Amino acid sequence: MLISEVIDGVKAYCGHDWGGPIMDDTTRDQVLWGPVDVGCTGIVTTCFASADVIRQAHARGANLIICHEALFWNHGDHTCWLAGNKTFAAKRALLEECGITVWRLHDHIHSGIPEDGRLVDGIFMGLADKLGWRDYVRGDTARPMEFEIPETSAGELARFLVGRLGLAGTRIVGDADARVRTVLVPMHLIGQFDNATTTRMDSGFDCLVTMEATDFTTSEYVRDSAQLGLGKAMICIGHFNVEEPGMEYMLRWLPRAIGADVPASFVASGDPWTYVTA
């Protein structure tokens, strides 16, 4: 099976609308490196095709990495600005040495994978499944980002997330002793959606589990809420740590999508954080 056929199979299996029709010339889902007109010897799914992931894919005999995020550290994966960059040169050399093709799968997997007669967001369904929270989803069940869980404290929830997701640690903003039943996994907290997230939290969420967190917007709001006795907390997990389970979940449906028995495995890009505590 050619790599191009793997890619076409996955795209055909998924939905085709992510805030509008997914168009081949504008989608994030592009081949970021390598040829597609060669036989696929194996597939590795991951969130970020880091240098270590590339090495592990090669060691497993895989020549196709399907990643969720960009390869070269910027939106759109532009490389014109990287002329002379030593890290870019070294990563490019590693890719060439290992004979790896990298395809980004972002828009299609978010737009939906078939499950129980409907399309569900493959990334956030993967997170819900990893956490064992499928039965706790409220709101939009096709994009599980709102949950009502058995009551716990924010600190206990943070410890659960660290263990279940295999993290090095995490951070809590607000009241670590706050009682938590309702949890929101918001979209990016990088300015654009911060006010909307603050409004949603005020309307009935005890705790945020965030991909990013902006210190001067949502973090300040949660801290003030806690200091004013409103029992709010935010657990800062990290973008890749939140979305990576969806790429592991992909292994469940990938064989159906490509209709062939190609060796496939998941390699975690892993928690990027190392924590130094007082």
Describe each model-derived feature in a short phrase.
Residues M1-A278:
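Active-site catalytic microenvironments in core metabolic enzymes, especially phosphate/sugar-handling
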